[in-house]
């Protein structure tokens, strides 16, 4: 036993007395954690391979590669057990690592039990290179194994990660900056040729959601960190998608470089000056020079998992140039573990017991306002119209309610329950979050002093903006196609079958109204909201407890369809729901009367907002564009059958009280059957927004909606109609022509002249215009699908320069 204990000490005596700078590492060389020979250096001394103490627990060590000449010895690679078990190799101080005389690299503990080896044999020597790559080589100089082939969370200049045909190669973020355990984010170089970032489960690593990608399925070749400092994804056709440009970041001679998937899910490229106060970046610290995605707090909204931060917390930024995400608890909440904030937050008081009666609950709890935080999910009830006091009372007496959200302008109240997910700072909605906490008169005290401290200083906690409304999981049923629904009413009437019973399969959760009910609700169909080809829309109010505002459409023009086709279509549409589709509340099928009842959209159609004298804020227009894109994506790709809207225009995009865009009026919609990508039909839509293929003898596809969206996107950017005959410069008459000319001449700024907010965000303006020009390609096959469109708008994928569209004929009135 004594011999075993003395063995590592004997190895230290036989080994060199310090970490040596050497070109080759010979067989028999040994490292031990607490000996002078604890690492092998590269020839320049820039990098080291060996034992690195674990932060916070110096009794244990990693097998790692690190930058050796900088003060914090930044780790760029660390050993993991196996692909099947990606846990880190963490060993006690009496372990040793040896390049054995048998030609193997072996990590053993004091008893001689092997704890790790890279599973290669016949090694003749090893080398720690100045690139940061530790290599095991054969006698003929061929590489047997290298750390560059087994990346952890970082890549270095000259490192290449190819798309493997049989197994994904990936970077896995750490769990925390000082915790090297496999974390919650993954950069995947996939076998299908795509490079993507994923939110993943811990510890299993199963993928939750992709939140950024190059969208290069079938075309990707390799992820490259060039020796000039440029990070890009090479494609099989020889082109490159830049992850970072490499421009303006200083020479490789003056700076150390690395690109790391950080614990907050952002893939950042960093530089560090090799000399004190060197270069324009200055400072002896790592500085981020590029990052993907640009705003991680807004990039992830996942139905599964907690989002960027843990449950019941929210994501903001640390205020530094590196834009590191910072997770925070709302007031009266505290972290489960201050050292592991990714675990989320919990209430710092005794939760509301469901055994309390209403009077006791009102005595023990109250609501306190907070501002500027957004938890987009977790809604479970909505009240409208209602006062703020009543909104608060309904939350206080409900043991499931953790907070209420109130909109003063529309008298609307939403209740949210725990756990709260996807929390982030938000600056684009004016609403108040009412957080349920112990009453100031209650005998219940806060559990920790941190919450009391916040309570005393809560006036300083105002964050300066308000909460975005999440989608209610109980109330987001999309409206049924007017055309299809009217036909269904006629079929059901002819057969003397009540509409609600005509299909036992569809089981649509819709209310049946009588004609008298709707006549009374609309005060005799008095106030007209709008009119379309199939009928007139009136404003009304239901006589329910909440006095719900509604929009009632009287259908007066129907076309016959076969019952079989209609039943297939109505069942499909009736089962759809999305926050960017207007919700159908019910219907009337009484005699010859056909009426549809919709949720009322406070701010009316987009054209009213967009083309009035006052220009909407740039961020408002951005959110509207993204909302319309996501609504179309749902119709095209996420329904059981694809739905082509066929009439996307500003008049058919309605805005709720928070200016959330919702697609409406499915009167011209067309469904595609399974495995069908095109359909033949007569010309539908509105002049100025219909795609060129409508005028040709070819089938139409979802790409007609993509074309219409391209027109609307330019209207949102420019805040003007597609065609304006009274402009001074006739070259600006048709916005699609004008935008193309501005893009080709490099004068995108002319499209937003006088719009200071847009000018400030000119890069995003250019991105939106580029996406629009892709949508407006005359050849439908050249247009992106709506998934690609949303990714391009979000900045999740690179956007190549669009071809010059051959024709904008359909934009003409």
Swiss-Prot record:
Its EC number is 2.7.11.1. Residues 488-813 are cytoplasmic. The active site is at 647 (proton acceptor). It is a single-pass type I membrane protein. Glycans are attached at residues 24, 57, 164, 168, 219, 242, 407, 441. It is found in: Membrane. Residues 22-149 form the Bulb-type lectin domain. It is an enzyme of class 2 (transferase). GO terms for molecular function: ATP binding; carbohydrate binding; protein kinase activity; protein serine kinase activity; protein serine/threonine kinase activity. Its main location: membrane. GO terms for cellular component: membrane. Belongs to the protein kinase superfamily. Ser/Thr protein kinase family. Involved in innate immunity. Required for the expression of defense-related genes PR1A, LOX2 and CHS1 upon biotic stresses. Required for basal resistance to the fungal blast (M.grisea), bacterial blight (X.oryzae pv. oryzae, Xoo) and the herbivorous insect brown planthopper (N.lugens, BPH). May be involved in several defense signaling pathways. Involved in the promotion of seed germination. Required for the expression of alpha-amylase genes during seed germination. Involved in resistance against the herbivorous insect brown planthopper (N.lugens, BPH). This is G-type lectin S-receptor-like serine/threonine-protein kinase LECRK1.
């Amino acid at each position: 036993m004594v011999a075993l204990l003395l063995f590592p000490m004997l190895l230290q005596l036989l080994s060199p007395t310090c970490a040596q700078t050497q070109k080759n590492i010979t067989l028999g060389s040994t490292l031990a954690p607490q000996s002078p020979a604890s690492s092998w250096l590269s020839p320049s001394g820039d990098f080291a391979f060996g034992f690195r103490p674990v932060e916070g627990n110096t009794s244990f060590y990693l097998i790692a590669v690190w930058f050796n000449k900088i003060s914090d010895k930044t780790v760029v690679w660390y050993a993991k057990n196996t692909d099947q078990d990606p846990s880190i190799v963490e060993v006690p101080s009496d372990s040793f690592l040896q390049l054995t005389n048998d030609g193997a690299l072996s990590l053993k503990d004091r008893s001689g039990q092997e704890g790790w080896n890279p599973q290669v044999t016949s090694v003749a020597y090893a080398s720690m290179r100045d690139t940061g790559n530790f290599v095991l080589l054969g006698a003929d100089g061929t590489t047997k194994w290298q750390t560059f082939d087994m990346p952890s969370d970082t890549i270095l200049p000259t490192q290449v990660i190819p798309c493997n045909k049989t197994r994904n190669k990936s970077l896995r973020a750490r769990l925390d900056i000082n915790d090297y355990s496999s974390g919650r984010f993954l950069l995947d170089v996939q076998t299908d040729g795509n490079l993507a970032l994923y939110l993943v489960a811990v510890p299993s690593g199963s993928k939750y959601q992709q939140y950024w990608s190059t969208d290069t399925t079938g075309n990707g070749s390799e992820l490259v960190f060039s020796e000039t400092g440029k990070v890009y994804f090479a494609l099989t056709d020889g082109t490159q998608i830049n992850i970072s440009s490499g421009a303006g970041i200083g020479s490789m001679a003056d700076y150390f470089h690395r690109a790391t998937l950080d614990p907050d899910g952002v893939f950042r490229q960093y530089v560090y000056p090799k000399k004190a106060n060197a270069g324009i970046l200055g400072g002896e610290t790592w500085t981020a020079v590029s990052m993907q995605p640009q705003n991680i707090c807004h990039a992830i909204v996942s139905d599964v998992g907690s989002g960027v931060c843990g449950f019941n917390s929210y994501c903001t930024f640390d205020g530094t140039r590196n834009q590191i995400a910072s997770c925070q608890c709302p007031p009266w909440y505290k972290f489960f573990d201050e050292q592991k904030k990714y675990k989320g937050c919990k209430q710092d008081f005794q939760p509301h017991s469901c055994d309390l009666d209403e009077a006791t609950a009102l005595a023990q709890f109250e609501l306190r306002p907070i501002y500027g935080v957004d938890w987009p999910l977790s809604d479970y009830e909505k009240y409208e119209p209602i006062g703020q006091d009543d909104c608060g009372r309904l939350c206080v007496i409900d043991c499931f309610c953790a907070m209420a959200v109130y909109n003063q302008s529309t008298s609307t109240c939403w209740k949210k329950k725990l756990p709260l997910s996807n929390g982030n700072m938000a600056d684009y909605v004016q609403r108040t979050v009412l957080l349920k906490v112990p009453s100031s008169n209650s005998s219940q005290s806060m559990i920790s002093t941190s919450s009391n401290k916040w309570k005393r200083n809560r006036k300083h906690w105002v964050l300066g903006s308000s909460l975005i409304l999440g989608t209610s999981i109980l109330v987001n049923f999309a409206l049924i196609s007017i055309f299809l629904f009217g036909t269904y009413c006629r079929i059901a009437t002819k057969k003397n079958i009540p509409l609600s019973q005509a299909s036992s399969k569809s089981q649509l959760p819709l209310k049946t109204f009588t004609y008298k009910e709707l006549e009374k609700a609309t005060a005799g169909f008095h106030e007209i909201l709008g009119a379309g080809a199939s009928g007139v829309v009136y404003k009304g109010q239901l006589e329910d407890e909440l006095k719900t505002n509604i929009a009632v459409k009287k259908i007066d023009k129907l076309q016959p369809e076969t019952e079989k086709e209609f039943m297939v279509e109505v069942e499909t549409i009736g089962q759809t729901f999305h926050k960017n589709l207007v919700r159908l509340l019910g219907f009337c099928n009484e005699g010859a009367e056909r009426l549809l009842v919709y949720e009322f959209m406070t701010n009316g159609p987009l054209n009213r907002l967009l083309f009035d004298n006052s220009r909407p804020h740039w961020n408002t227009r951005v959110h509207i564009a993204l909302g319309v894109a996501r609504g179309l994506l749902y119709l095209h790709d996420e329904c059981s059958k694809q739905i082509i809207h066929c009439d996307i225009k500003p008049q058919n995009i309605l805005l709720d009280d928070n200016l959330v865009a919702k697609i409406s009026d499915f009167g011209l919609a067309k469904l595609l059957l399974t495995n069908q990508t095109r359909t033949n039909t007569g010309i539908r839509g509105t002049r100025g927004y219909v795609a060129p293929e409508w005028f040709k003898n070819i089938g139409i596809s979802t790409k007609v909606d993509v074309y219409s969206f391209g027109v609307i996107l330019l209207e949102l950017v420019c805040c003007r109609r597609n065609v304006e005959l009274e402009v001074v410069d006739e070259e600006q008459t048709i916005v699609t022509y004008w935008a193309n000319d501005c893009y080709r001449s490099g004068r995108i700024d002319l499209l937003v002249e006088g719009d200071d907010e847009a000018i400030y965000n000119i890069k995003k303006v250019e991105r939106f215009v580029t996406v629009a020009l892709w949508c407006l390609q005359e050849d439908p096959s050249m247009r992106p699908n709506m998934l690609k469109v949303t990714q391009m708008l979000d900045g999740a994928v690179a956007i190549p320069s669009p071809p010059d569209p051959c024709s904008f004929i359909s934009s003409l009135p």
